[in-house]
Structures are given as C-alpha cells and as structure tokens.
C-alpha cells in the first residue's frame, strides 16, 4: 500500500487513509473532524467504490462513471492503482475502457442525452413524476446502448412506453 504515489489532493489522501473502513466510517470520521462538505462527499464516493471490483465491460464502466461527478472516476482509478498495485493491470485496462467511452462521446450524464424534458413535453408527455421516470428509464437504456442516444429513437421509445402504461 503506497499512498505516497497519490497526487497531493486532500480528498485523495483522506480516501486512501479511510479506504478500508467503509463509507459510513469515513463519513463519521470526517464529520467529527469538521471536514468541508465537498471533501467529505468526494471521499465518501471514493471509499464507497474503492472496495468494489470494477469490470472492464463498456456498459459497466459507463454505469460507474455516471454514478459520480466528472473526474472522480479517474481519481478512483488512481486510488486503486496506488493502494492495490496487484490490480494495476486490470485498472489500466479499465482506464483504457473509460478513455474509449469518452472518446466515442458515449452519454454518461442525463444532461447529455439526446432527449430532454422539453422534448418529451413537445411529444405529448405530461410534466410530472411520470416524465422523470421516463427520462430515468431512457437514461438507463442509453447507458447500456449508447448507439441509441438519438432524439427520434428515444422519443419513439418514450411515447410508445407512455401510451402502453
């Protein structure tokens, strides 16, 4: 375990220190130390995912990337490489997968989807919780099938499903 190889960023260093205690333990310790909320949130995310086995599959990488803020996935990989050198080869392959996801422009944020709430309203979907559910369902679909992130395709999918319910 070599945390000394990490960049001198407060959240990364704290995550390395607290990585084996779990997210709840890290949150409690940082709260008692009166750590700022941004650092606490960053550390909790890193600690939560540190113990998870990441998969090289494009879909799984997109799902993990979408669950955290921009840049946090790269910090997670740095943390894993520093603290788990025996997994460095796998982490390197996951990094290449993440780079491929980014270079292709795969959608990993709901805001990057080809369809917005305004598009759904224009297509006849009523605003409200149901529209949020439709957007969430479309987003999960796009995470698994990034090639389907096209406005017409997603609108047809949303309207079709909305009329079935």
Language-model features: locations:
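Charged substrate- and nucleic-acid-binding regions of tRNA-handling and nucleotidyl-transfer enzymes
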Residues: 83-165
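Conserved, hydrophobic alpha-helical core segments of structured domains
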Residues: 1-90, 165
